[in-house]
């Protein structure tokens, strides 16, 4: 599973909240974070990949084995909504991701001045995405209150139940080969870029 989105959207915070069950202090990701968490009685490997400029071209190395995408958007960042939309649609236009389910997390719902769900769906052109793949929108925060609920758990449960036939076949193939490029290609490519 890939965890993607613009920088500062809250990707890493969401990842470790899901893994550890609590909020931890994070710093901007330079390369990637990878963790395994239990979802619906299954072990799911989640790759949280930096969206910094030099790293973005490397995302394609993760695509062939992706069974689901979680795309995180900052609900308060009106100035970057066009960028967030373009980024999302560029990712989903890749051939390797045809039919892969995507969960869109409208994050930081605990903050003031959040855009409405309807406004964000329109600005991200969610209806267009839903024509070609399973896609759902979730309201998320790692600081829920009685008034502000979070759908983080529902998000991970939903996307883990929506694998494509192609991704299932690929997952089985690579599971039987622990030294396959599924693990090593992204790691080695990322390392070479980070130290250039």
Give, region by region, the residue ranges found by the protein language model.
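Long, low-complexity intrinsically disordered regions
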Residues: 170-196
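TRAFAC-class small GTPase G-domain
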Residues: 1-165, 194-196
């Amino acid at each position: 599973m890939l965890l993607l989105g613009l920088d500062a959207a809250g990707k890493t915070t969401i990842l470790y909240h899901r893994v550890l069950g609590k909020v931890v202090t994070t710093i901007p990701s330079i390369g990637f974070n990878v963790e395994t968490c239990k979802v619906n009685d299954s072990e799911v490997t989640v790759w949280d990949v930096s969206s910094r400029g030099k790293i973005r071209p490397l995302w394609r190395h993760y695509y062939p084995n992706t069974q689901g995408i979680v795309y995180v958007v900052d609900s308060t960042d009106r100035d970057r909504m066009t960028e967030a939309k373009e980024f999302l649609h560029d990712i989903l236009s890749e051939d390797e991701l045809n039919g892969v389910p995507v969960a869109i997390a409208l994050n930081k719902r605990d903050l003031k001045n959040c855009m409405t769900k309807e406004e964000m769906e329109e600005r991200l052109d969610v209806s267009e995405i839903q024509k070609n793949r399973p896609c759902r929108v979730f309201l998320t925060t790692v600081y829920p209150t009685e008034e502000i609920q979070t759908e983080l758990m529902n998000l991970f449960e939903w996307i883990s139940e929506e694998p494509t036939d192609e991704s299932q076949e690929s997952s089985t193939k690579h599971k039987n080969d622990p030294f396959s490029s599924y693990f090593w290609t992204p790691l080695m490519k990322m390392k070479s870029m980070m130290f250039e």
